Amino acid sequence: ADRLHNMRTLSSMLPSKQYKIVGETLYIFAPLADRLGLNRIKTELEDLSFKYEHPDDYQLMLDNLKRSEMERDDAINDFTPAIREALDRMGVDYELKARIKSPYSIWQKMQRKNIPFEEVYEILAIRIIFRPRDRQQEIDECYRIYAALTQIYKPDPSPPALLCHETL
Protein backbone atom coordinates (compact mmCIF):
# COMPACT_ATOMS: atom_id res chain seq x y z
CA ALA A 1 0.00 0.00 0.00
CA ASP A 2 2.88 2.35 0.82
CA ARG A 3 4.53 1.70 -2.56
CA LEU A 4 1.27 2.31 -4.41
CA HIS A 5 0.82 5.60 -2.54
CA ASN A 6 4.43 6.56 -3.37
CA MET A 7 3.80 5.86 -7.05
CA ARG A 8 0.57 7.86 -7.07
CA THR A 9 2.40 10.86 -5.60
CA LEU A 10 5.64 10.45 -7.54
CA SER A 11 5.29 13.77 -9.35
CA SER A 12 6.07 15.63 -6.11
CA MET A 13 9.50 13.98 -5.83
CA LEU A 14 12.84 14.92 -7.36
CA PRO A 15 13.57 13.21 -10.72
CA SER A 16 16.53 11.30 -9.23
CA LYS A 17 14.27 9.87 -6.53
CA GLN A 18 11.55 9.12 -9.11
CA TYR A 19 13.98 7.07 -11.20
CA LYS A 20 15.01 4.92 -8.23
CA ILE A 21 11.43 4.32 -7.07
CA VAL A 22 10.22 3.51 -10.59
CA GLY A 23 12.97 0.91 -11.05
CA GLU A 24 12.24 -0.77 -7.72
CA THR A 25 8.53 -0.73 -8.44
CA LEU A 26 8.74 -2.23 -11.90
CA TYR A 27 11.24 -4.95 -11.05
CA ILE A 28 10.34 -5.83 -7.45
CA PHE A 29 6.93 -4.59 -6.31
CA ALA A 30 4.85 -5.15 -9.47
CA PRO A 31 6.03 -8.79 -9.83
CA LEU A 32 5.43 -9.30 -6.10
CA ALA A 33 1.88 -7.97 -6.41
CA ASP A 34 1.37 -10.33 -9.35
CA ARG A 35 2.59 -13.34 -7.36
CA LEU A 36 0.23 -12.42 -4.54
CA GLY A 37 -2.70 -12.34 -6.97
CA LEU A 38 -3.12 -8.56 -6.70
CA ASN A 39 -3.56 -8.00 -10.43
CA ARG A 40 -5.16 -4.55 -10.23
CA ILE A 41 -2.36 -3.28 -8.02
CA LYS A 42 0.29 -4.89 -10.25
CA THR A 43 -1.24 -3.23 -13.33
CA GLU A 44 -1.43 0.18 -11.67
CA LEU A 45 2.18 -0.09 -10.46
CA GLU A 46 3.35 -1.06 -13.96
CA ASP A 47 1.39 1.73 -15.65
CA LEU A 48 2.61 4.36 -13.20
CA SER A 49 6.19 3.14 -13.64
CA PHE A 50 5.75 3.25 -17.42
CA LYS A 51 4.37 6.80 -17.20
CA TYR A 52 7.56 8.04 -15.51
CA GLU A 53 10.11 5.82 -17.24
CA HIS A 54 8.80 6.35 -20.81
CA PRO A 55 6.47 9.38 -20.69
CA ASP A 56 6.23 9.83 -24.48
CA ASP A 57 5.44 6.17 -25.11
CA TYR A 58 2.96 6.19 -22.23
CA GLN A 59 1.12 9.16 -23.72
CA LEU A 60 1.18 7.53 -27.16
CA MET A 61 -0.49 4.40 -25.70
CA LEU A 62 -3.17 6.54 -24.04
CA ASP A 63 -3.77 8.40 -27.32
CA ASN A 64 -3.99 5.14 -29.27
CA LEU A 65 -6.42 3.65 -26.76
CA LYS A 66 -8.59 6.78 -26.91
CA ARG A 67 -8.49 6.80 -30.71
CA SER A 68 -9.56 3.14 -30.92
CA GLU A 69 -12.23 3.36 -28.21
CA MET A 70 -15.19 3.57 -30.59
CA GLU A 71 -13.91 0.57 -32.56
CA ARG A 72 -13.70 -1.48 -29.33
CA ASP A 73 -17.19 -0.39 -28.31
CA ASP A 74 -18.51 -1.47 -31.71
CA ALA A 75 -16.75 -4.83 -31.35
CA ILE A 76 -18.36 -5.40 -27.94
CA ASN A 77 -21.79 -4.45 -29.29
CA ASP A 78 -21.36 -6.78 -32.27
CA PHE A 79 -19.80 -9.66 -30.36
CA THR A 80 -21.78 -9.99 -27.12
CA PRO A 81 -25.48 -10.31 -28.14
CA ALA A 82 -25.00 -13.87 -29.45
CA ILE A 83 -23.17 -14.81 -26.24
CA ARG A 84 -25.93 -13.31 -24.08
CA GLU A 85 -28.59 -15.11 -26.09
CA ALA A 86 -26.87 -18.50 -25.72
CA LEU A 87 -26.23 -18.08 -21.99
CA ASP A 88 -29.78 -16.83 -21.37
CA ARG A 89 -31.17 -19.82 -23.27
CA MET A 90 -29.10 -22.12 -21.04
CA GLY A 91 -30.36 -20.39 -17.89
CA VAL A 92 -26.85 -19.41 -16.79
CA ASP A 93 -26.51 -16.78 -14.06
CA TYR A 94 -23.69 -14.71 -15.54
CA GLU A 95 -22.08 -11.34 -15.98
CA LEU A 96 -20.07 -10.20 -19.00
CA LYS A 97 -17.13 -7.90 -18.37
CA ALA A 98 -14.94 -6.21 -20.94
CA ARG A 99 -11.27 -5.85 -20.06
CA ILE A 100 -8.90 -3.51 -21.85
CA LYS A 101 -5.19 -4.36 -21.84
CA SER A 102 -3.16 -1.82 -19.89
CA PRO A 103 -0.93 0.75 -21.62
CA TYR A 104 2.22 -0.89 -20.22
CA SER A 105 1.13 -4.35 -21.31
CA ILE A 106 0.34 -3.14 -24.84
CA TRP A 107 3.68 -1.34 -25.06
CA GLN A 108 5.54 -4.44 -23.83
CA LYS A 109 3.90 -6.57 -26.51
CA MET A 110 4.77 -3.99 -29.17
CA GLN A 111 8.40 -3.99 -28.02
CA ARG A 112 8.65 -7.76 -27.74
CA LYS A 113 7.12 -8.43 -31.18
CA ASN A 114 8.35 -5.24 -32.85
CA ILE A 115 4.86 -4.36 -34.08
CA PRO A 116 2.78 -1.16 -34.21
CA PHE A 117 -0.25 -0.56 -31.98
CA GLU A 118 -2.61 -1.52 -34.82
CA GLU A 119 -1.18 -5.05 -34.87
CA VAL A 120 -1.82 -5.76 -31.17
CA TYR A 121 -5.02 -7.77 -31.41
CA GLU A 122 -5.58 -8.76 -27.79
CA ILE A 123 -6.37 -5.27 -26.53
CA LEU A 124 -9.95 -6.20 -25.70
CA ALA A 125 -11.14 -9.31 -23.88
CA ILE A 126 -14.62 -10.34 -22.79
CA ARG A 127 -14.85 -12.30 -19.56
CA ILE A 128 -17.81 -14.44 -18.62
CA ILE A 129 -18.23 -14.67 -14.87
CA PHE A 130 -20.91 -17.15 -13.94
CA ARG A 131 -22.36 -18.45 -10.72
CA PRO A 132 -22.60 -22.23 -10.87
CA ARG A 133 -25.95 -23.77 -10.00
CA ASP A 134 -24.19 -26.53 -8.11
CA ARG A 135 -20.59 -26.34 -6.89
CA GLN A 136 -20.15 -30.07 -7.54
CA GLN A 137 -21.05 -29.58 -11.20
CA GLU A 138 -19.09 -26.37 -11.78
CA ILE A 139 -16.55 -27.90 -14.19
CA ASP A 140 -19.31 -29.60 -16.19
CA GLU A 141 -21.11 -26.27 -16.45
CA CYS A 142 -17.89 -24.63 -17.71
CA TYR A 143 -17.70 -27.21 -20.48
CA ARG A 144 -21.38 -26.73 -21.38
CA ILE A 145 -20.82 -22.98 -21.66
CA TYR A 146 -17.66 -23.57 -23.69
CA ALA A 147 -19.54 -25.96 -26.01
CA ALA A 148 -22.34 -23.44 -26.53
CA LEU A 149 -19.89 -20.64 -27.30
CA THR A 150 -17.87 -22.72 -29.74
CA GLN A 151 -21.06 -23.20 -31.73
CA ILE A 152 -21.10 -19.42 -32.20
CA TYR A 153 -17.38 -18.60 -32.35
CA LYS A 154 -14.80 -21.14 -33.45
CA PRO A 155 -11.87 -21.70 -31.05
CA ASP A 156 -8.52 -20.07 -31.70
CA PRO A 157 -6.21 -22.96 -32.63
CA SER A 158 -3.12 -21.34 -31.10
CA PRO A 159 -1.81 -22.89 -27.87
CA PRO A 160 -3.20 -21.55 -24.58
CA ALA A 161 -1.45 -18.50 -23.18
CA LEU A 162 0.95 -18.71 -20.27
CA LEU A 163 -1.91 -18.24 -17.83
CA CYS A 164 -3.48 -21.41 -19.27
CA HIS A 165 -6.57 -19.73 -20.63
CA GLU A 166 -7.90 -20.34 -24.09
CA THR A 167 -9.46 -17.81 -26.41
CA LEU A 168 -12.33 -18.08 -28.81
Indicate where each model-derived feature is located:
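Nucleic-acid processing machinery
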Residues: 3-168
